[in-house]
């Protein structure tokens, strides 16, 4: 069976579940619920959330979804919001009076911060005085170096020693090579 025939026989995927409004309070059941969409299309924005919520139930592992990929078919419409038609302030602000409570908090805040004295400083940076500073013992070079650094220092020292002794010994060894009978 050719790939083209397989594609043409494949059923068209159903659009995913739409978000339904959650259960409302018993006192608000008589109010109509409106569904407001930001965009007119039903394109969702989060495929992982759609999978978790069960929006991709009709997808199987063997389907080639990339061949007929369509955002409208694979994603949930996550850009819809449900709103109540009327606002019932009795249930919304249960026991909280906006004007008086907010006014009380603001007056307490202003009273507290008006009593706090803030000292303005001309200089932005301050350094500690000498008696507060901690004295640090200087470490020896050997204490700070690891074994690889000590090996490198030894190698340089031996190279210097060889170069210094070569100057002295080369003259003596050169004379021995020139007159081997003389020194025996």
UniProtKB/Swiss-Prot annotation:
Any one GO molecular-function label of the UniProt entry: protein serine/threonine phosphatase inhibitor activity
Signal peptide (from-to): none
Induction annotation: Expressed in the late phase of the viral replicative cycle.
Keyword NADP: no
Keyword RNA-binding: no
Similarity comment: family membership: Belongs to the asfivirus DP71L family.
Protein name (database record): Protein DP71L
